């Protein structure tokens, strides 16, 4: 593996624009939940921003990048606030484009999960550490969102749509590909796997088993 490329590779130098699309989508998803919960404008903005940058903050904390990227590059925060404002202002209209928002959300999940995996590889974590770091990077914002909104984290019970599982699989793919390809190629391969798993699960072709105990 090209250690120099891995050391110098950052999201800002790679798919920065796609990263911001993911931030925008995550912010909208968080803000829409706040609107449904009848939060005021401040609450909606906070929930949207936390959802958008929470996963990235976890990623940066796990990989030793301080302060987090969203504080070093305020474009992320401005994008998150824009997404939250759009959701607050046009919540009913945006809800009609659920499939489009889901596509952006999946893109953000794929990018955050795989970038978290790359960061974990850079600091020398093993395969399980890479998978765990990547998964938390992808789903961390959503977990924080649901806890703030007093909801059971959606990733824990939505078996009809692979989400955390897709993030973990994408991170694992990055670990497998990184020794043989450039960081960009490894991330692209992992991201494509995340998108594929999200696609097949939305069509209910793949589900995780659920254990039911007698009442």
Curated annotation (Swiss-Prot):
Membrane topology: Multi-pass membrane protein
Keyword tRNA-binding recorded: no
Alphabetically ordered keywords of this record: Cell membrane, Membrane, Transmembrane, Transmembrane helix
Gene Ontology CC entries for this record: plasma membrane
Keyword Transcription tagged: no
Subcellular localization: Cell membrane
Protein origin, superkingdom: Bacteria
Chain ranges passing through the membrane: 15-35, 39-59, 75-95, 101-121, 123-143, 162-182
Chain segments annotated as coiled-coil in the UniProt record: none
Alphabetized InterPro entries for the sequence: Gly_transporter (IPR005115)
Family from the record: Belongs to the UPF0126 family.
Name of the protein: UPF0126 membrane protein DR_2368
Organism of origin: Deinococcus radiodurans (strain ATCC 13939 / DSM 20539 / JCM 16871 / CCUG 27074 / LMG 4051 / NBRC 15346 / NCIMB 9279 / VKM B-1422 / R1)
